[in-house]
């Protein structure tokens, strides 16, 4: 997760392919789409994506006060069944002068494509959109490359004594 110093530095920069900043606290569709897009990690650079709630695009804090209800709403996104496979994410509140920030860190999925309500969302620069066929193909190929077959997987707990060399 980001440190408070890193968070303040991010707020001084515009949105990018792995940063989304918003003042909204109620647009769950927008949040889920962003989390899905960050999970898909279309550039393939294995960097986390950050959804920052409580600031405007110019970095100015909106004066948000993050309560337990908002924290619970955001953490429930992971398990509500709308984003599959489930995203790997952490949610943290930061208290700053001028208001709170709620930061959702989303790790890239090992098994893309990740779908929100059946649609594959990707992030191209500072905007998110539904994946094209070509983008979907890239994500599917990444999934296939991450799946190891049984003969390439380690057999944990075995030793050389377990190998039968006599047919």
Where in the sequence are the language-model features?
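Conserved N-terminal catalytic/coupling substructures associated with nucleotide/phosphate chemistry
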Residues: 1-167
């Amino acid at each position: 997760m980001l440190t408070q110093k890193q968070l303040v530095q991010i707020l001084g920069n515009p949105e990018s392919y792995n940063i989304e900043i918003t003042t909204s606290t109620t647009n769950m569709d927008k949040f889920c789409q962003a989390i899905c897009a960050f999970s898909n990690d279309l550039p393939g650079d294995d960097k986390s994506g950050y959804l920052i709630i409580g600031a405007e695009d110019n970095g100015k804090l909106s004066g948000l006060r993050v309560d337990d209800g908002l924290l619970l709403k955001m953490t429930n996104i992971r398990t509500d069944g709308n984003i599959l496979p489930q995203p790997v994410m952490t949610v943290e509140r930061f208290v700053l002068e001028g208001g709170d920030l709620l930061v959702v860190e989303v790790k890239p999925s090992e098994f893309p494509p990740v779908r929100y309500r059946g649609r594959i969302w990707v992030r191209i620069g500072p905007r998110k959109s539904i994946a094209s066929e070509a983008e979907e193909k890239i994500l599917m190929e990444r999934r296939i490359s991450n799946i190891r077959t049984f003969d390439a997987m380690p057999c944990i707990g075995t030793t050389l004594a377990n190998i039968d060399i006599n047919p």
